[in-house]
Regions:
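Short arginine-rich
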Residues: 298-307
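Glycine-rich phosphate/adenosyl-contacting loop at the front of the ribokinase-like
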Residues: 1-74, 86
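Short alpha-helix plus adjacent loop in nuclease-associated cores
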Residues: 110-113
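Short alpha-helical functional segments enriched in proximate histidine and acidic residues
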Residues: 95, 278, 295, 299
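Short pre-catalytic strand/loop immediately N-terminal to key active-site residues, enriched for Gly-Thr
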Residues: 45-54, 253-266, 286
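A glycine-rich beta-to-alpha transition motif near the start of alpha/beta enzyme domains, typified by
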Residues: 72-100
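Short, small-residue alpha-helix embedded
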Residues: 71, 207-208, 261-285, 289, ...
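Ribokinase/PfkB-type carbohydrate-kinase core domain
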Residues: 1-29, 51, 89-104, 116-255, ...
Length: 331
């Protein structure tokens, strides 16, 4: 029997409203490690523009991005029975993302987040509704699953997913822990960590998972591998990214920006999309590292997490034009 989907993404979906601020300030301490966005209190604050983007979120962005790269994708998520939920379904239809695992929750609104853009960075106001989801058992057999952000109410779903993975040993798993999943940590999500084929985190998230102050990349890789993931990708913002398959560590520089980034929302998801899609296509780890930053570069040139996502011909064309220095380096 021919497999219907190459990859099924699992996680919350939202509408993002991007508000571009002009009259704000940023206050930082400890060498710009901790920064605060400041607005005038009890005042009318002007903004430059508003852009509304439906069907976004870590898993949604990956499902859309992988579909643009030519893979057959679907998403298991939940929405409200309202106008915004219908917008999300239409966006998935347009992007050729399978919708049969989208649970419509009557009586609840669709997740709606506000993204405050100032310069090239963003601060996001979030709220996850307490949705009911279709159980993972509904997925039957999937060759790849990508699992990411869900709200605090969804702990039971994590246990259901662990049960599904026990019954489907051949299913490969991409895991990018969201805010609540980082809070739960490997102690409560140990079975998911142990079944993870490829894990995506940034350097700070890796430190948080391991409860360490060390930022040494090899120390972080060793600690995360002990939790179970076979391949790990650690992003480090504009500095580049790292990856490990337990046998070898690599550093990958960023793809050169054609112009200064416009807005960074979705850069990490675009990286995960390029990386994971290459693996689903059967490409080696070193090639996955080349695919990932190209997608991130394209996304930060646009507002929102999806507008800049590349098609496969576009990505391969950019790779052919890449400088000779754009390749993984063993570390």
């Amino acid at each position: 029997m021919k497999q219907k989907y190459d990859l099924i993404a699992i996680g919350d979906t939202t509408i993002d409203a991007f508000i571009k601020l002009t009259e704000a300030s940023v206050h930082c301490r400890l060498g710009h490690k901790y920064c605060e966005l400041c607005l005038s209190f009890a005042d009318k604050v002007p903004y430059e523009s508003l852009t509304v983007v439906p069907a976004v979120g870590n898993s949604s962005n990956l499902a859309v991005g992988a579909a643009r790269l030519g893979l057959k994708t679907a998403i298991l998520t939940a929405i409200g029975a309202d106008y915004y939920g219908r917008q999300i379904l239409e966006a998935y239809r347009r992007e050729k993302v399978g919708r049969e695992f989208v649970k419509i929750n009557k009586g609840l609104p669709t997740n709606y987040h506000f993204v405050l853009n100032y310069e090239a960075e963003r601060t996001i106001l979030i709220k996850h509704q307490e949705y009911r989801y279709y159980e993972p058992a509904r997925l039957a057999k999937a060759p790849w699953i990508y699992f990411s952000s869900m709200g605090e109410h969804a702990l039971g779903f994590h246990h259901q997913l662990a049960k599904y993975l026990r019954a489907h040993r051949d299913t490969k798993v991409g895991f990018n822990p969201g805010t609540f999943q980082l809070k739960l940590g490997p102690a409560k999500l140990g079975e998911i960590y142990r079944r993870t084929t490829v894990m995506f985190v940034n350097r700070e998230e890796a430190q948080r998972i391991l409860k360490t102050r060390s930022s040494d990349i090899k120390t972080l890789f060793r600690g995360l591998h002990r939790l179970g993931p076979k391949i790990i990708a650690i992003t480090d913002g504009p500095k580049g990214a790292y990856a490990s398959d337990e046998k070898q560590y690599y550093f990958m520089p960023k793809y050169p920006d054609p112009k200064p980034p416009l807005e960074r929302t979705g850069a990490g998801d675009a990286f995960s999309t390029g990386f994971l899609s290459a693996l689903v296509y059967g490409r080696p780890l070193t090639e996955a590292l080349r695919w990932a930053p190209v997608n991130s570069m394209a996304v930060v040139q646009e507002i929102g997490a999806q507008k800049g996502l590349l098609t496969k011909p576009q990505l391969l064309s950019l790779l052919r034009k890449a400088p000779k220095s754009y390749k993984p380096k063993k570390i």
